[in-house]
């Protein structure tokens, strides 16, 4: 247990930090107060047409406190119109009925006690990251460096006990949003946690949750987020966008094909795709996805990937019973990292060498796990007859394996409770 002296020391540190934050805020305010000349009615109208739908502030137990503390970022000389528009888009997206501008006098008069109350509410509602992202975006939208403001936000982050690594991520995300750099944003998600998308995808004007209209979006990079769809076959080469990113979508009996576009799937689920190729793309990324209950045949593996980075993705209960099917998962010039295959089964023998995963042309499989996977569940009579036929013809009988490789590399791949041959090279 902590001693009274230790507790007193912590309280003093918190008091000193709060005083420092307040001084930064006061210094910021004392820079001067230019008269506002913005058309707030127009800003509210613009925000209603382009709200940040799904903003996490909607779950705040006391939204006034969230916006009150956020407004302290604007209690400075010459707040920018872009900052106010961002704030209005937050409130509209979070279904806040009041005019946030009415809270501005209270933000100017913020006391230490009120600041502590705001911070405690934000932390209690698990909105710390969302708040800091909004605060940093507002800072960046000033389009000029403001040392006082950055120090103020750093002080708030310290009071909220946010670790330095998380602050770094917040800054990176905020920079992507402020510059509307969607490609950099998707690359960031690919290297970090897809969970970040839940609190940030709605910020991008290139984002849509309407799959039916997505084909007509004439933009360099289109983000489709939080979509649930079933029973549709989509040729992405028919879409106008050059790059297409699906984020946190749920698909059932859906197929996606593209030979020309860069396509990303992040945090998506695919299920019940039978005798059709679920994803066939020639360039892109797949991360944190799940493929469940899919069936392959000779013409259609579950996935057919070329020049793709696929990572941290799970394949469960995917099977084929077609002897002419070369594989369930076909990858070419592709890197597969940290993926897990569970109860993926190849039944029915093989008319040629076959595998669960077929990797060709300098593909890399690394740090993957195969659990309870199996190949070639033929009955003994079928096996005996097949052996006689191939022995008579003096050719090597085709075999099934979990991995079927050609000019490809396997690193640290684990097989747990699997049956059948583990690895073979393509002839």
Residue ranges and their predicted role:
Residues 206-213, 228-237, 248-257, 271-280, ...:
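Extracellular beta-strand/beta-solenoid scaffold signature
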Residues 201, 221, 226, 231-233, ...:
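Detector for repetitive beta-architecture
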Residues 216:
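Cyclic nucleotide-binding regulatory domains
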Residues 5, 9, 16, 23, ...:
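Intrinsic-disorder/low-complexity peptide segments enriched for small residues
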């Amino acid at each position: 247990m902590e001693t009274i002296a230790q507790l007193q020391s912590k309280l003093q540190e918190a008091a000193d930090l709060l005083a420092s934050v307040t001084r930064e805020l006061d210094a910021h305010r004392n820079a001067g107060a230019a008269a506002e000349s913005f058309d707030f009615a127009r800003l509210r109208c613009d925000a209603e047409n382009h709200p940040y739908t799904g903003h996490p502030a909607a779950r705040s137990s006391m939204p006034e406190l969230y916006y009150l503390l956020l407004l302290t970022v604007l209690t400075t000389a010459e707040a920018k119109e872009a900052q106010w528009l961002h704030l209005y888009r937050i409130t509209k997206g979070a279904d806040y009925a009041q005019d946030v501008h009415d809270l501005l006098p209270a933000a100017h008069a913020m006391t230490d006690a009120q600041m502590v109350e705001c911070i405690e509410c934000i932390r209690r509602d698990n909105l710390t990251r969302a708040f800091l992202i909004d605060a940093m975006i507002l800072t960046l939208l000033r389009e000029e460096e403001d040392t006082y403001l950055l120090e103020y936000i750093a002080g708030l982050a310290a009071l909220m006990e946010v670790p330095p690594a998380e602050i770094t991520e917040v800054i990176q995300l905020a920079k992507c949003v402020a510059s509307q750099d969607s490609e950099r944003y998707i690359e960031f998600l690919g290297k970090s946690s897809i969970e970040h998308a839940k609190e940030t995808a709605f910020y991008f004007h290139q984002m849509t949750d309407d799959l039916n209209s997505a084909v007509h979006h004439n933009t360099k990079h289109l983000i489709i987020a939080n979509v649930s769809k079933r029973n549709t076959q989509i040729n992405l080469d028919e879409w106008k966008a050059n790059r297409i990113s699906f984020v946190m979508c749920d698909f059932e009996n859906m197929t996606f094909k593209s030979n020309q576009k860069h396509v990303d799937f992040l945090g998506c689920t695919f299920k019940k795709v039978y005798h059709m190729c679920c994803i066939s793309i020639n360039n892109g990324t797949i991360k944190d996805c799940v493929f469940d209950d899919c069936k392959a045949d000779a013409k259609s593996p579950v996935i057919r990937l070329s020049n793709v980075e696929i990572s941290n993705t799970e394949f469960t209960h995917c099977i084929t019973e077609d002897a002419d099917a070369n594989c369930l998962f076909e990858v070419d010039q592709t890197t597969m990292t940290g993926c897990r295959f569970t109860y993926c089964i190849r039944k029915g023998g093989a008319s040629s060498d076959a595998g669960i995963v077929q990797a060709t042309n300098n593909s890399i499989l690394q740090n993957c796990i195969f659990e309870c996977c199996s190949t070639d569940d033929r009955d003994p009579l079928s096996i005996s007859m097949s052996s006689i036929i191939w022995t008579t013809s003096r050719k090597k009988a085709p075999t099934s394996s979990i991995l079927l490789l050609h000019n490809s590399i396997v690193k640290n791949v684990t097989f747990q409770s699997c049956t059948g041959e583990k690895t073979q090279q393509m002839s």
